Design a protein with these regions (language model features):
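Conserved nucleotide-sugar phosphate-binding/catalytic loop shared by glycosyltransferases and other
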Residues: 3-9, 26-75, 192, 312
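Active-site-proximal region of nucleotide-activated glycan assembly enzymes
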Residues: 41, 52, 111-173
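An amphipathic, basic-hydrophobic alpha-helix
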Residues: 65-94, 112
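Acidic donor-binding loop of glycosyltransferase active sites
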Residues: 93-94, 255-270, 277-278
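C-terminal "capping" alpha-helix adjacent to the active site of nucleotide-linked donor transferases
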Residues: 303-310, 314-331
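C-terminal alpha-helical cap of glycosyltransferases
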Residues: 325-328, 342-358
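A short, well-ordered alpha-helix in the C-terminal region of glycosyltransferases
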Residues: 331-343
């Protein structure tokens, strides 16, 4: 029986594509192992699944000064030796890395053990972890063709982003149950991602009295961010509902939405376009990120797929104005989204991984 070792973590975008691949390798009766951190979101998303989860020490690849930069190399080194032991014990036939700082020691350890490694980059520009991992990978799969110019040409394979069956086979009728049930109003889904939801939540909460005039609003605020007072004041009977997190049913919820406000992570954009959902993107600011979401948003705005509001310009007035403009041209936006080429991303990546197994 063949064995695959998956790794990725730090944000949901570095984990959910791995979940999509797990579904298919389970069907193929492969042994599946996962390497992540003990405290990252990957532990929450994968740790409770019926697969072996190996936690390793991790540092953080920062682009700014911090005293922790002096001790993190020690954690990364420890993570490398832990990964080396995992590779020797598990002996995977192939390793798939989705990115995030936890993956770097895993990729290098696999390379030392002569285990083939495939990496995947979701964003339009490669993250630091994937830049460091690329020399040790046989191939780097990319979601968007624009990413290829930043990587060695002989290693790039355009695959799209792996999307879970829960997204591609979603049921809008099931998802509708999550939304406030006021007939005649379109459903608005707002979610800020696993990180950086705060600024979006703040402005949306201020705008709620105006939003509920025109929408049934489902607001996914993130773990620990629930505003119980607001949730009670504007309950489902008044057109607004907050939830902290949606995992298994998220595909159904997304399918039921008429319009979406989202961060501009590559996986989120890919799912929105795949399901033909008119949307407004609010990219994370460069002050708290490497600017990848800003670049993602620029490209898809230029292509006509996405409407964008910069985080610095996000306020109730700009949000309401953006939604009014989007609803006024919603049919044209849907027609444009229908032009997007759907790739069998999971199939392409699975085939590439299988080719590496001798």
């Amino acid at each position: 029986m063949k064995t695959i070792l998956l790794t990725g973590g730090g944000t949901a975008g570095h984990v959910t594509p791995n979940l999509a691949l797990m579904e298919h390798f389970r069907d193929k009766k492969w042994n599946i192992h996962y390497v992540g951190s003990q405290t990252g979101i990957e532990y929450d998303l994968v740790g409770n699944l019926s697969i072996p989860y190996h936690a390793i020490a991790t540092g953080k690849l920062r682009r700014y000064f911090s005293w922790q930069n002096f001790i993190d190399p020690l954690f990364i080194l420890l993570g490398f030796f832990q990964s080396l032991l995992i590779c020797l014990r598990v002996r995977p036939d192939v390793v798939f890395s989705k990115g995030g700082f936890v993956t770097v020691p895993v990729v290098i350890a696999a390379w030392v053990c002569r285990i083939p490694v495939i990496c995947h980059e979701s964003d339009t520009t490669p993250g630091l972890a994937n830049k460091l991992s690329t020399p040790f990978c046989r191939y780097v799969c990319v979601t968007f063709p624009q990413t290829a110019k930043f990587l060695p040409p002989g290693k790039v394979v355009v695959t799209g982003s792996p999307v879970r069956d829960a997204i591609t086979r979603s049921d809008p009728d099931l998802g509708a149950d999550y939304y406030p049930a006021i007939s005649g109003k379109p459903r608005l889904l707002v979610f800020g991602g696993s990180l950086g939801a705060g600024p979006v939540n703040q402005q949306v909460e201020i705008a709620v009295p105006e939003l509920v005039r025109n929408f049934n609003v489902l607001h996914v605020v993130g773990t620990g961010n629930l505003n119980a007072v607001l949730n009670a004041a504007f309950d489902s009977g008044k057109g607004y509902r907050q939830v902290e997190f949606i995992q298994d049913e998220f595909g159904d919820v997304l399918a039921a939405a008429d319009v979406v406000v989202s961060r501009a992570g590559a996986n989120s954009i890919y799912e929105l376009i795949l399901l033909r959902k008119p949307h407004i993107l609010v990219p994370l600011s460069a002050a708290v990120s490497r600017g990848d979401q800003i670049e993602n948003a620029k490209i898809f705005s230029a292509e006509g797929y996405s409407q964008v509001i910069d985080e610095s310009e996000l306020n109730p007035a700009s949000l309401l104005k953006g939604l009014d403009e989007l609803m006024a041209q919603i049919d044209q936006v849907k027609d444009k989204l229908a032009e997007f080429e759907r790739l069998d991303s999971v199939g392409r990546i699975v085939a590439l991984l299988e080719e590496q197994v001798v």
